[in-house]
Swiss-Prot record:
Residues engaged in binding Zn(2+): 124, 128, 134
Name of the protein in its database record: Endoribonuclease YbeY
HAMAP family the record matches: Endoribonucl_YbeY
Enzyme class per UniProt: hydrolase
Protein family according to the UniProt entry: Belongs to the endoribonuclease YbeY family.
GO CC annotation terms, alphabetical: cytoplasm
Organism: Synechococcus elongatus (strain ATCC 33912 / PCC 7942 / FACHB-805) (Anacystis nidulans R2)
Compartment(s) where it occurs, according to its Swiss-Prot or TrEMBL record: Cytoplasm
InterPro entries, alphabetized: MetalPrtase_cat_dom_sf_prd, YbeY, YbeY_CS
Underlying gene: ybeY
Cofactor: Zn(2+)
NCBIfam families: rRNA maturation RNase YbeY (TIGR00043)
Keywords, sorted A to Z: Cytoplasm, Endonuclease, Hydrolase, Metal-binding, Nuclease, Ribosome biogenesis, rRNA processing, Zinc
Biological classification of the source: Bacteria, Bacillati, Cyanobacteriota, Cyanophyceae, Synechococcales
GO biological process assignments: rRNA processing
């Protein structure tokens, strides 16, 4: 039985390859579940992975982050709300939504496949749903390292531009 019940939504006109999103995100969640806080432990989880165009992600970015421009990935974590309301341990714990802009991912996929970029961004989004953030260089390096590990776990090459960032030690500058 899968640990994660994933809903994948295609809300863009771009044709995307059929990738095993359910399997990959389930494997990533299975990998990291032992590290989750005790009150985030559940027998199963739910999440949504939505692929959109730049207009939709720009609207979301404007509405929720007050940034009126497209971005590559947004994550709307539900765990804090779910835990505050209490949850039935017999029911799946809803993690939230990961929204990825396919056109922005395509622009970023210079020197590697769009599929690789989309997998990289989905790993990043899932980490945000699980409480990870990157307000400083050290936490960004930890997050990028985890993303690299997850891509290796599902045999997807790490985007070349990220390899440089992962291998760089965190800056000591403020």
């Amino acid at each position: 039985m899968a640990l994660l019940d994933l809903t994948v939504q295609m809300a863009c006109s771009d044709r995307l390859p059929d990738l095993p999103w359910q399997d990959w995100l389930d494997r990533w969640l299975t990998d990291i579940q032992p590290q989750l806080p005790e009150d985030w432990q559940a027998p199963t989880y739910e999440a949504c992975l939505r692929f959109v165009d730049d207009a939709e992600i720009q609207q979301l970015n404007r509405d929720y982050r007050q940034l009126d421009k497209p971005t590559d990935v947004l994550a709307f974590a539900a765990l804090e709300d779910e835990l505050a309301l209490g949850f039935d341990p017999e029911e799946p714990l809803y993690l939230g939504d990961v929204i990825i802009s396919v056109p922005t991912a395509q622009r970023q996929a210079q020197g590697h496949a769009l599929e690789t970029e989309l997998v990289w961004l989905s790993a990043h989004g899932l980490l945000h749903l699980l409480g990870w953030d990157h307000p400083n260089e050290e936490q960004l390096a930890a997050m990028l390292t985890q993303q690299e590990r997850w891509l290796q776990l599902v045999a997807v090459p790490v985007p070349p531009r990220w390899l440089d960032e992962v291998s760089q030690p965190p800056s000591s500058e403020p």
